[in-house]
Regions:
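Ligand-binding pockets and gating/stacking loops
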Residues: 1-324
């Protein structure tokens, strides 16, 4: 079958003083182009979503290996004992919504205390964080202490790391009864900040997750992973990609600006990536999965800003320069 190249469906323009080329469907992100390092020469090994997610998160398509967040938490620890050191938030909208398996933030062969904790992005991020009716904090502390004592007795006999994990999880859950309500109380955010993100929080949007990510980072969470499901544009890519971009553009740009304003960006690495790219050839009115050349961007954390690294060939098919 003859393959026909599909032209860019939205105009590109040079943005910022660096002149980074960005599509016009990201008007907010284009204002922070000078903070980005854009990598245009990625390749991957898996052409379907789930194994490609696994490769991105673990470095292999083999399930059961520790995720990147688990390795970082294992190696570096967290700067807080009041909240999980590895938190995952998901949002959805704009296209075909491919599922994300929870093993993408699993700890693999590392102890399970290093796995990611998924927060709900709408409503209460952690269910049942409040005490049951008739149970005050003092009584709850007594219950946790009694359970921990029993777990400790058993662990002295079998020396099971999963028992130690369970003990740590109970302690974390108890502390989160105070730390999570404080995390979600946005009364300390200015109207200007909320307007910048375009959200009032806890509405399930990517923007709300970006705001929550900044608050988690402020409180010492080591690794925060945001997923937005809605990029699988096998058809109607012109309209669908614009719709998906609109859902993430403002929040992502606000996160970079907010981190910069708070002097946190230099110590916080922001990575915007996907599991693979899309073909330069048409698939009807869309594009198929593509593993031979695609892009990502990073900002902060010591990354050199305002630059483009690597390149594909003239068709955007193969990564040919500084391949990653």
């Amino acid at each position: 079958k003859k393959l026909t190249c599909m032209a860019p469906q939205h105009p590109f323009k040079a943005c910022g003083e660096s002149g980074v080329e960005m599509t016009e469907i990201f008007p907010h992100l284009s204002t922070v182009a000078d903070e980005m390092c854009v990598v245009r020469s990625l390749k991957t090994e898996a052409i379907n979503h789930d194994p490609a997610h696994t490769f991105l998160n673990t470095g292999t398509t083999i399930s059961g290996r520790p995720s990147m967040g688990s390795w970082l938490l294992y190696g570096l620890g967290a700067e807080t004992e009041e909240l999980p050191g590895f938190v995952v938030l998901t949002s959805v909208g704009g296209g075909q919504n491919q599922p994300i398996a929870s093993r993408q933030w699993h700890s693999g062969f590392l102890p399970s205390r290093f796995q990611g904790v998924e927060f709900h992005s709408k409503g209460d991020p952690v269910l049942y964080v409040n005490n049951a009716p008739g149970v005050n904090l003092e009584r709850q502390r007594d219950v946790v202490d009694a359970v921990q004592q029993l777990n400790g007795i058993r662990n002295d006999v079998v020396d099971d790391p999963e028992i130690a994990t369970r003990i740590a999880q109970y302690e974390m859950a108890f502390r989160m009864q105070t730390s999570v309500p404080s995390l979600m109380d946005l009364s300390d955010e200015t109207e200007e900040t909320l307007d910048m993100y375009g959200t009032r929080g806890s509405d399930g949007s990517f923007a709300a997750n970006c705001l929550l990510a900044r608050r988690l980072a402020e409180r010492g969470t080591r690794f925060i992973q945001l997923y937005h499901r809605g990029w699988d544009h096998h058809g109607n890519i012109k309209n669908a990609s614009a719709g998906t971009a609109k859902l993430v553009d403002q929040g992502a740009a606000a996160l970079l600006k907010d981190l910069q304003q708070r002097d946190m960006l230099k110590d916080t690495l922001v990575v915007w990536a996907c599991e693979f790219g899309r073909t330069p050839m048409a698939q009807g009115s869309g594009r198929d999965h593509h593993i031979k050349g695609y892009s990502m961007w990073m900002a902060g954390g010591g990354i050199k800003p305002g630059m483009t690294y690597g390149a594909t060939d003239e068709l955007g098919y193969n990564a040919v320069e500084n391949v990653v």
